[in-house]
């Protein structure tokens, strides 16, 4: 987000829960702070599904609200719990010119509940927002790569990966320290049992997943220059919890092959083999 003016900004607040509601109220938005207050659905067992349904208000909310004349955006944190911890995450202004961009900030779930309650009692409530965030120049950062050469098909590459960076307010243990450790364990365990893979096993710890995936983009660019042949890639980026299975991005024929591997995982209670998205860096 951009910063607020030096003295902050104070404005009336308009609360919406969906983009449909935002468009319905577009003529009421000018000069106001838009408060996106759509909670994640607690009835969904898969928290990533609940997250996916709610994340667009944080990702695109400021861009759309700015086009309707809003002066700022407050977004309910994407969190199933009621607590006082605001959550950081990616947001975008799309192709809005710098002069049209408005400040955006997350509010904790408890804060969102309180603000919504206060607005129900006083529609003319004014909200004061002050923040001094800014974009600094890029600095050079690095992917970390290691590999075990394949003994039969060294030019066929299998990637196991995770991302090194995390949001600055957290310690990154789940996102994605656990994935980094899991990725590094793969070659360590194979070497421990003296297993030599037929294809090249490459461990890639990507930098800059959280705000642009530039580590993955750079890896892809370099790989194309070298004309490398990747036959398989997997990323662990879902926290350090008990493994449940795999979301697979492939065509139907390859997915059928991968699904046949499920019998090897059943003794470990790993049962989820479904077509879906791959890791963000993959």
Question: What is each residue range found by the language model?
Answer:
Residues 1-27, 93-173, 185-198, 221:
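Soluble metallo-hydrolase cores and metallopeptidase-like ectodomains found primarily
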Residues 2-96, 101-103, 269-271:
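Extracellular/luminal Protease-associated
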Residues 6, 11, 102-104, 112-113, ...:
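Metal-dependent peptidase/peptidase-like ectodomains
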Residues 15, 33-37, 71-76, 104-106, ...:
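Structural recognition of the beta-strand scaffold that forms the well-ordered cores
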Residues 26, 45-49, 83-88, 157-158, ...:
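Short, solvent-exposed loop/turn and secondary-structure capping segments
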Residues 52-60, 106, 110, 136, ...:
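Soluble non-cytosolic domains of exported or imported proteins
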Residues 66-71, 75-78, 116-120, 188-195, ...:
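Sec-exported extracytoplasmic/periplasmic mature domains
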Residues 188-214:
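Short helix-loop-beta-strand segments that form the rim/entrance of peptidase-like active sites
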């Amino acid at each position: 987000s951009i910063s607020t003016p030096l003295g902050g900004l104070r404005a009336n607040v308009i609360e919406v829960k969906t983009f449909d509601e935002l468009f319905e109220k577009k003529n009421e938005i000018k000069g106001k702070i838009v408060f996106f207050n759509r909670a994640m659905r607690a009835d969904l067992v898969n928290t990533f599904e609940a997250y996916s349904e709610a994340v667009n208000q944080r990702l695109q909310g400021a861009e759309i609200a700015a086009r309707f004349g809003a002066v700022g955006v407050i977004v309910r944190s994407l969190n199933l719990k009621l607590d006082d911890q605001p959550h950081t995450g990616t947001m975008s202004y799309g192709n809005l010119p710098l002069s049209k961009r408005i400040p955006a900030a997350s509010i904790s779930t408890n804060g969102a509940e309180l603000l919504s309650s206060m607005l129900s009692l006083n529609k003319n409530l004014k909200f004061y927002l002050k923040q001094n965030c800014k974009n600094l120049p890029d600095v050079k950062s690095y992917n970390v790569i290691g590999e075990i050469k394949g003994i039969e098909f060294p030019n066929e590459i299998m990637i196991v990966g995770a991302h090194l960076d995390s949001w600055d307010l957290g310690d990154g243990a789940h996102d994605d320290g656990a994935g980094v450790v899991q990725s590094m364990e793969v070659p360590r365990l194979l070497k421990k049992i003296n297993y030599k893979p037929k294809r090249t096993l490459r461990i890639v710890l990507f930098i800059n997943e959280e705000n642009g995936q530039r580590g993955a983009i750079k890896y892809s660019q370099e790989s194309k220059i070298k004309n490398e042949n990747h036959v398989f890639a997997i990323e662990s980026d879902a926290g350090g919890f008990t493994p449940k299975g795999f979301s697979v991005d492939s065509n139907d024929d390859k997915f059928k092959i991968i699904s046949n591997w499920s019998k090897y995982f059943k003794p470990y209670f790993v049962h989820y083999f479904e077509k879906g998205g791959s890791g963000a860096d993959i």
